[in-house]
């Protein structure tokens, strides 16, 4: 065979193919440019959509979800309140409004307020009582630390226990708050104590304030909470039913806790009686009586009240009575910080969320009801129907991922399309390689044909392979044909089921469309016409594309193997061998004729392919470009295959579920019909109102917006152009102005500094000279301002109250009208918005297109202007750099020289300033010293004169004091005794007593140094007057008889006297009390039976050691109560002790 002829015949002239590829490359570049613009616009819109979604849509959806959650919790809580309180719908509405309002205005949320309402309702409060008590409950919660539930419980128990009205809840909170502020009892401690003692205290007549004051005093002593409550409860309970021991103890103490009407006296009076009755008792005696009266467990608390005394208890009670406003004030103080304000803001947000939930609740209720019905229908379906619904849901769920994959494919195709323009040269470079490969392939084919024809051994080997290949393909075909038959039958059934499903859906959809005035025929005709037009436009192009793709499949497969790793001649040989075997099997003749036919077909195929590419490649590129531009993101080439695959999947699924789909479709259509009917009935009104409002609001804006945009762009362009042109001149002028200012400042700096120094010195001198008048005038002005403010303040307060009252009355009186107007305005706005929606969308599109076009058109100008601006700036700086450096150097040099020359003047001026300042201060010091000296002299003279007056006043005061007492000696024994103690030095000389007087020592201490001189001058007169007073008292008592009332006093005197007698020394006889009684009518009382009638007889020890004697003369004594008896007994006892001490006897206390 002639190999040269074979090679010449197999050589392919690819010049036409190359030219067509060059044309396709230019078309691809133009397509890439257009796609790039579209891709940029799409990216911008995508970014805008993402930004709006992230910044607006998602936060609003999140807030709506949170609002629904918060609102549902609040509604559930209020339903509990309604159920417990038995509230009607109208009462529930009022309570909801109050809870929302309290949540917005306080640091507590509306839900917390609702929980407080629940606790009050559980305590038996009615709706009106709950609403009256809630502000006080929240005030108490704010003071106690924020637990609304505990505060409401404490409030309810306190109000009920003391029989208070619910509107007194605020006062209860004020009492708790004031007690917490003034004592160690926190509000939680007070609430805990009230749980135990409040009912008992109220039943015994104690008020809330007095009980709280008692608990507070106990808390100061460390008795808090439940311990204080049980202590006070135990004490009051024992008093309510006293035992015999308690009655005896009360009789011994002389106390009574009930009045004549059988009512318990206030607690402060009880404390007063106990404090007086136990004043003279020892600690053991007092504790014994208190334990008897109040019990062992209440001893500590009652001791705390006794130690505090009735005055502190009464003061605390009055403070709690007048404590209105304390809780609010304390709560405001405690919440005056950022954390509390944030909590209050959270409460306000929750109130807003509840309002939003209330607005959405009707629509949400309908949606939930519809979903519930759908779920109930699903539950009631047959098992087969339920399975079909699940399958259909899975299909719908898969639609999203499929669309996602499709979108990714579209995006990838766009990116590949952009990359085509860069692959063009590479494809052109590979054309030579492809031509060489084709030539090698032809050579191999020629060699194979020669070997098969000339070599019998090779031909026999090839022929022996034919049966094996045929057997293999035959077995595969025998297995495949039954499967394809089964698949065809299955697809036929699927088609029938799909037809039935389509008829069912079509009938239902037809009925639905008829409600809107649309027939299924019209809809089908329109859809069919649309699909037909699309297929007609795409049919020819896809036909040609399909022919090209079918030819290129084998080549793509061969080069794919090489791309996967089988590279070089071996990979190409393997791919060619696979293609050859496939073509040979396709002929069905596994012999030499088949091989010859393969090569003939291959030759014809290559020639046909080359002709096809040369002829149709330009048309293919043009049509492909048009399709990629018109169909989004160039997916047209992949859409048919994707649609075919998806259609097959959907057909298979539809065939499976078609048996149960009619029932499901019927149920779904019924639900949809109900929803659409409701929407259709209300939709015209909504649309009409919305369109009117939107039209009114945005019509003018839409009409004027294009003009505004165009004018704005023109103005901006003109400004930029003008700025670019004038920038060099502006920079040069600015530099010149700055240099001129700096140079002028340097030249005039000495004069400026000198003038400043003169001004400062003048101000200092004037200030030093006039500091006194300035201060005096300032004080006068300040006093005048204060006096004027004080005079006007009541009027200002009155006017402010009137203004606030008038403003509140006006707001409250017009609140319904304001709310109604707001609602109408909101509805009108929504109606206009809906009416204007089409125009708004159209206007928005126009604006977007205009902005996009303006941006695209203006970018080159903006870049050009920026370049010109940068050039001008660089040129201006370069041209002025030299002058700037020169001017800066000159300015620095001049500034340094001027400062150096002015240093001397500055030092001199500073020295003068300091010198003048010191001189001024020195002159002022002399004046100040003079003033202080004169002031001291005046003070000393005043004090000296006043000292003389004090001495004189002291003498006169003592003289008058003694004269007054002397004149009143005969009127009262008590006055005589006090006067005798005041002049104790004279009395002890008269009676022969030598012990010091404590009373005189105290009187000397408290009289003061001012009386020292006067007392020194009056010592002799005082001694004479004291002797005269003692003699007068003795003479007066000798003529007086004792008169003691017999109403139980004698027994008291006897008890005290016996105690006194037990303290006498053993050397003295113990006088009998009956002797004392018998001697009561005698002016002389011989207590020790000495037999002496002379009261002035010296008292000395007798020879038989019978003891000393004491003579006491007692006049008439009027006993008014037990205190007088105590004073008389103690006076006798003390006088006896003094007498015995005067004789040197040791008297035990």
Swiss-Prot record:
Membrane topology, as annotated: Multi-pass membrane protein
Top-level division of the source organism's lineage: Viruses
Region (Disordered): 1084-1109
Keyword Transferase: no
Transmembrane regions: 389-409, 431-451, 561-581, 689-709, 726-746, 781-801, 840-860, 865-885
Biased composition (Low complexity): 1094-1106
UniProt cross-references to Gene3D superfamilies, sorted A to Z: Leucine-rich Repeat Variant
A single Gene Ontology CC term: host cell membrane
Subcellular location: Host membrane; Virion
UniProt keyword terms in alphabetical order: Host membrane, Membrane, Transmembrane, Transmembrane helix, Viral release from host cell, Viral tail assembly, Virion
Keyword set includes Protein biosynthesis: no
A Pfam family it matches: PhageMin_Tail
GO biological process, one term: viral tail assembly
Entry function: Plays a role in virion tail formation. The length of the tape measure protein is proportional to the length of the phage's tail.
Protein name: Tape measure protein
Gene name, Swiss-Prot/TrEMBL: TMP
């Amino acid at each position: 065979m002639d190999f040269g002829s074979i090679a010449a015949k197999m050589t392919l002239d690819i010049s036409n193919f190359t030219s067509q590829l060059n044309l396709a490359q230019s078309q691809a570049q133009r397509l890439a440019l257009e796609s790039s613009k579209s891709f940029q616009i799409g990216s911008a819109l995508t970014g805008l959509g993402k930004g709006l979604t992230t910044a607006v849509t998602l936060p609003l959806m999140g807030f709506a979800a949170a609002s629904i959650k918060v609102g549902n919790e609040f509604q559930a809580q209020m339903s509990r309140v309604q159920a417990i309180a038995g509230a009607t719908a109208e009462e529930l509405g009022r309570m909801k409004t109050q809870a929302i309002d309290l949540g917005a205005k306080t640091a507590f949320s509306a839900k917390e307020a609702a929980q407080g309402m629940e606790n009050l309702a559980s305590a038996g409060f009615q709706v009106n009582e709950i609403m009256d008590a809630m502000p006080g409950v929240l005030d108490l919660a704010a003071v106690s630390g924020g637990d609304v539930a505990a505060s409401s419980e404490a409030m309810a128990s306190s109000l009920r226990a003391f029989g208070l009205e619910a509107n007194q809840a605020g006062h209860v909170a004020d009492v708790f708050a004031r007690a917490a502020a003034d004592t160690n009892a926190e509000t939680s401690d007070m609430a805990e104590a009230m749980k135990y003692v409040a009912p008992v205290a109220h039943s015994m007549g104690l008020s809330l304030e007095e009980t709280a004051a008692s608990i507070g005093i106990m808390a100061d002593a460390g008795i808090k909470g439940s311990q204080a409550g049980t202590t006070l409860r135990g004490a009051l309970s024992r008093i309510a039913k006293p035992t015999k021991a308690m009655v005896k103890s009360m009789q011994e103490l002389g106390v009574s806790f009930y009045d004549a009407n059988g009512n318990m006296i206030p607690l402060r009076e009880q404390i007063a009686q106990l404090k007086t009755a136990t004043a003279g008792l020892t600690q053991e005696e007092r504790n014994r009586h208190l334990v008897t009266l109040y019990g062992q467990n209440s001893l500590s608390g009652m001791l705390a009240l006794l130690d505090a005394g009735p005055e502190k208890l009464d003061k605390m009670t009055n403070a709690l009575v007048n404590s209105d406003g304390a809780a609010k004030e304390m709560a405001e103080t405690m919440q005056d910080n950022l954390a509390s304000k944030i909590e209050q803001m959270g409460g306000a947000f929750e109130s807003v969320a509840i309002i939003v939930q209330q607005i959405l609740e009707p629509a949400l209720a309908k949606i939930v009801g519809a979903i519930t019905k759908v779920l109930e229908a699903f539950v009631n379906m047959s098992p087969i129907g339920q399975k079909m619904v699940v399958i259909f849901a899975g299909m719908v769920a898969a639609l999203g991922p499929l669309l996602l994959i499709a979108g990714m494919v579209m995006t990838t195709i766009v990116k590949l399309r952009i990359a085509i323009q860069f692959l063009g040269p590479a494809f052109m470079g590979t054309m030579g390689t492809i031509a060489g490969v084709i030539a090698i392939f032809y050579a191999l084919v020629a060699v194979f044909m020669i070997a098969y024809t000339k070599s019998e051994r090779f031909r026999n080997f090839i022929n022996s392979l034919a049966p094996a290949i045929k057997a293999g393909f035959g077995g595969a075909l025998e297995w495949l044909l039954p499967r394809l038959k089964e698949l065809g039958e299955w697809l036929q059934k699927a088609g029938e089921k799909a037809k039935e499903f389509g008829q069912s859906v079509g009938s239902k959809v037809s009925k639905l469309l008829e409600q809107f005035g649309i027939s299924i025929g019209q809809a089908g005709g329109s859809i069919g016409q649309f699909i037909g037009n699309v297929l007609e436009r795409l049919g020819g192009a896809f036909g040609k594309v399909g022919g090209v793709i079918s030819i290129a499949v084998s080549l793509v497969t061969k080069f794919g193997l090489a791309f996967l790793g089988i590279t070089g001649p071996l990979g190409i040989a393997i791919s060619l061998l696979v293609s050859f075997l496939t073509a040979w099997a396709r002929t069905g003749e596994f012999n030499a004729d088949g091989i010859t036919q393969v090569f003939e077909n291959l030759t014809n195929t290559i020639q046909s392919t080359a002709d096809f590419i040369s002829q149709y490649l330009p048309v293919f590129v043009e049509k492909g470009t048009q399709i990629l531009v018109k169909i989004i993101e160039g997916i047209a080439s992949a859409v048919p295959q994707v649609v075919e695959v998806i259609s097959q999947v959907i057909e298979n699924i539809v065939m499976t579920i078609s048996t149960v789909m009619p029932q499901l479709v019927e149920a779904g259509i019924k639900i949809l019909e109900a929803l659409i009917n409701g929407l259709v009935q209300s939709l015209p009104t909504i649309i009409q109102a919305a369109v009117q409002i939107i039209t009114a609001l945005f019509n003018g804006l839409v009409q004027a917006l294009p003009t505004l945009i165009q004018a704005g762009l023109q103005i901006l362009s003109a400004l930029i152009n003008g700025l670019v042109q004038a920038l060099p001149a502006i920079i040069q002028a600015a530099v010149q102005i700055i240099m001129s200012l700096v140079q002028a400042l340097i030249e005039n700096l000495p004069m400026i500094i000198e003038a400043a120094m003169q001004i400062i010195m003048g101000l200092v001198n004037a200030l030093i000279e006039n500091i006194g008048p300035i201060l005096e005038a300032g004080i006068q002005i300040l006093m005048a301002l204060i006096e004027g403010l004080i005079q006007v303040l009541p009027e200002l307060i009155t006017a402010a109250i009137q203004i606030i009252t008038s403003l509140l009355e006006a707001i409250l009186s017009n609140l319904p009208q304001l709310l109604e107007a707001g609602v109408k305005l909101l509805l009108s706005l929504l109606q206009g918005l809906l009416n204007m929606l089409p125009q708004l969308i159209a206007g928005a599109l126009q604006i977007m297109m205009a902005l996009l076009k303006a941006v695209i058109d203006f970018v080159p100008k903006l870049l050009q202007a920026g370049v010109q601006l940068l050039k001008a700036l660089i040129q201006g700086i370069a041209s002025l750099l030299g002058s700037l450096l020169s001017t800066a150097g000159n300015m620095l040099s001049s500034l340094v020289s001027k400062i150096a020359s002015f240093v001397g003047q500055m030092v001199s001026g500073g020295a003068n300033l300091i010198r003048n300042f010191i001189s001024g201060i020195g002159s002022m010091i002399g004046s100040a010293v003079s003033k202080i000296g004169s002031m001291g002299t005046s003070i000393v003279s005043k004090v000296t004169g006043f000292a003389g007056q004090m001495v004189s006043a002291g003498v006169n005061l003592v003289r008058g004091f003694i004269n007054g007492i002397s004149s009143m000696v005969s009127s009262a024994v008590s006055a005589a005794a006090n006067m005798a103690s005041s002049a104790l030095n004279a009395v002890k000389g008269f009676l022969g007593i030598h012990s010091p007087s404590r009373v005189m020592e105290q009187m000397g201490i408290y009289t003061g140094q001012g009386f020292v001189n006067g007392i020194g001058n009056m010592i002799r007169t005082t001694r004479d007057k004291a002797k005269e007073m003692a003699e007068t008292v003795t003479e007066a008592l000798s003529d007086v008889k004792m008169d003691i009332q017999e109403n139980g006093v004698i027994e008291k005197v006897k008890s005290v006297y016996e105690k006194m007698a037990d303290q006498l020394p053993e050397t003295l006889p113990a006088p009998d009390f009956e002797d004392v009684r018998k001697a009561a009518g005698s002016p002389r009382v011989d207590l020790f039976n000495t037999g002496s009638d002379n009261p002035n007889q010296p008292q000395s020890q007798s020879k038989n050691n019978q003891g000393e004697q004491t003579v006491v003369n007692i006049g008439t004594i009027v006993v008014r109560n037990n205190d007088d008896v105590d004073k008389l007994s103690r006076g006798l006892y003390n006088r006896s002790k003094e007498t015995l001490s005067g004789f040197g006897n040791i008297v035990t206390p």
